Structure formats: structure tokens, C-alpha cells
Amino acid sequence: MELAMGKVNEVLFMNRGEGESSYAQNSSFTQQVASMARPALENAVKTLFSKDFHLQALNAADLGCAAGPNTFAVISTTKRMMEKKCRELNCQTLELQVYLNDLFGNDFNTLFKGLSSEVVGNKCEEVPCYVMGVPGSFHGRLFPRSSLHLVHSSYSVHWLTQAPKGLTSREGLALNKGKIYISKTSPPVVREAYLSQFHEDFTMFLNARSQEVVPNGCMVLILRGRKASDPSDMESCFTWELLAIAIAELVSQGLIDEDKLDTFNIPCYFPSLEEVKDIVERDGSFTIDHMEGFELDSLQMQENDKWVRGENFTKVVRAFTEPIISNQFGHEIMGKLYDKFTHIVVSDLEAKLPKTTSIILVLSKIDG
């Protein structure tokens, strides 16, 4: 079953709640990524004060916010930098309006439960902060024209609106048999389909934001990417490769129909810096102020016990993959699947899992 656009919008979300497998409890890696990207966000906020906006309120949106602590850090960082600039410039009191966006399946209840006074402060502070939820797909319009000064998105833009089109032959045969993402054994058409889908979706994202962001407004985007030119390089596909192996083992045990594996392709693409740069320049609505890639260990390397490291990695992966994986293969076998995944990860630790590459992209809306 290929995932079409409407279906992806229904099943793409992080594990809900605050339990052992929840995203809220297993977002330590994305917190590391956000920490690395924080200077870019701080600089973007400072830059906004150098532009002639005559601000009374700064409107900011966090797109694909999920329900972990990263969103709270974004709010706190933005608010803190606004307070600092207001003191430096002796400007009038500003207000901060933050819009938190994700798809309809997102756990907005857990998200808003976590919005303590430590995050948003109180309305008598230098920069009063107001927060609203905005459910919907960021691949389309979410806000009125020229209403946003700052857009932030972390580890969301690499998700696609649907599984790439054209991954079955005219005879209806799966072209990426036994895999759920690009791999070394995938034919060229699979790689081309994934890049084409990402190009289409990222262009839609930029087009929607070009209408919503004010001229000279900023976007800070952090997404999973790759350094290698080859999208099948283990650096960018190892998580999906190991998951496909785990699923295939359950197929061999008769617990999953082989056809379900052969027809499933994860709606996600990890682009290179060159691919992202090319799409932004082709769109022409934004200038690239800053762009860089950086690497982080995929596992908590300070933990010596390889089983603990493997189990921790599985929890992180399960938190962001279980909803969409269980929709395809069934909720009842998720325990067995992720146990199998842990064993595969631990065995691969002997060969050392590759580092994870992330991309920071800072854009300014072109005036005119």
C-alpha cells in the first residue's frame, strides 16, 4: 500500500503522551540538534531588529513543532533575544506571538501542558508572550499574507507529503522490493522519484512561506540531510536500512505479508546541501543568509554498555517511526519489530554506526 498525500497527513506524527516510547521522553537527539542550531536562531532574531519593521508584535511560527521540549527552547530563545535587543535599543515594549504548527495527529495536549510560566513568562514582563496552536500541513498556506516575521522549523521539512510516485511498474510490481527507502540495491528510478518528490514538496513549502512571511522576514530551517552526493550512502539511510532488515525478518517468520514490505516506502528524504541550495535558488523567493551541515553521533556514545546504547537508539527511532510503521504493518507486532531492531543495532555497533548529518538553513524573504 503506497502512502498517498491525504493518508500521510493522517498517520505522520510522533508517538503521543509521556510514556516510555513517547517522543516527549525520547527527543534527546533532536535537542542536541536544536542546541547546535541555537546561534542561528539568536542571530535571526537580532537581524530582525536591524530592519525597519516598526514592530509592535513579533509574529513567529514553529512549523512541525511535535510535542517535545525543543519547541519550548525555541520560544525561550526568541523571547530572551527580544528582551536583550529591547534593552540595548531602549525600544518600546514589544509582544511576542508564537504559532505552534503540526499535522492534526500531533499531540497538542502534551505540548500545551508543557507550556509552563518558565517558558512563556507572564504578561507583565518586558516581552509578553502569547501562544496559539495551528494544526495543518505546512506544505500549504497556514497564515494570512505578510503576517510572519520569523519562521522556525526543526527536523520536519525532510518529511514528504506522500511516498514518492512511480515506484511500481506498469505491471504493478514493486520497484523497491524488500526496502523501505533508497538503498544500494534500489534501481535509479527510486532515487530519482525520491528527489523529485522532495523537490516538489520543498518548493510548495517555500511558495507558501513566500506569501506568509513579510519582506525581509527570516526563516531558520533545520533538517536531516547528508554530506555524500549518493543518497544511498549508509550515512543517510542506515536507520531505514536496519528497519527494513527487521521487517524482512518478521516477513520470513510469517508475521508480516511480504507484499506489505515491498509496497511500503517511507515518505521522507534526506537531501544534500547542494540539492537544498538548488531548490531555494530555483524558487527565487528567499536569499540564503547562512547554510551549513554538521555531524552528531547517532548514539549516546558516553554510554559504555552497547545494549543500553542500542536500546536507547531504538527508543528514539520508535518515537518518530512507530505511528507510520504500525499503520502499514499492524500495531500488534510493534513490540517484536523494535526488539528485533535493537538486536540488529547492537550487532552493527561492532562496525560503528555512521554519524548523522543535519543542515541549518537561514533564509531572508526577498523584498519586492
Swiss-Prot record:
Keyword set includes Magnesium: yes
Record's signal peptide: none
Cofactor: Mg(2+)
Keywords in alphabetical order: Magnesium, Metal-binding, Methyltransferase, Transferase
Source domain of life: Eukaryota
Molecular-function GO terms, alphabetical: caffeine synthase activity; metal ion binding
InterPro entries: MeTrfase_7, MeTrfase_capping, SAM-dependent_MTases_sf
Site feature: Involved in substrate discrimination: H152, R224, C268, V316, H331
UniProt-listed Enzyme Commission number(s): 2.1.1.160
Free-text remark on how the cofactor is bound: Binds 1 Mg(2+) ion per subunit.
Record GO biological process: methylation
UniProt binding sites for Mg(2+): N176, D262, F264, N265
Reaction(s) catalysed by this chain's protein: theobromine + S-adenosyl-L-methionine = caffeine + S-adenosyl-L-homocysteine + H(+); 7-methylxanthine + S-adenosyl-L-methionine = theobromine + S-adenosyl-L-homocysteine + H(+)
Metabolic or biological pathway: Alkaloid biosynthesis
Binding-site list for S-adenosyl-L-homocysteine: Y23, C65, N70, D102, L103, S137, F138
Residues the record lists as binding caffeine: T30, Y155, H158, W159, R224, F320
Described purpose of this protein according to its UniProt entry: Involved in the biosynthesis of caffeine. Catalyzes the conversion of 7-methylxanthine (7mX) to theobromine and of theobromine to caffeine.
Similarity annotation: Belongs to the methyltransferase superfamily. Type-7 methyltransferase family.
Name by which UniProt lists this protein: Caffeine synthase 3
Taxonomic path: Eukaryota, Viridiplantae, Streptophyta, Embryophyta, Tracheophyta
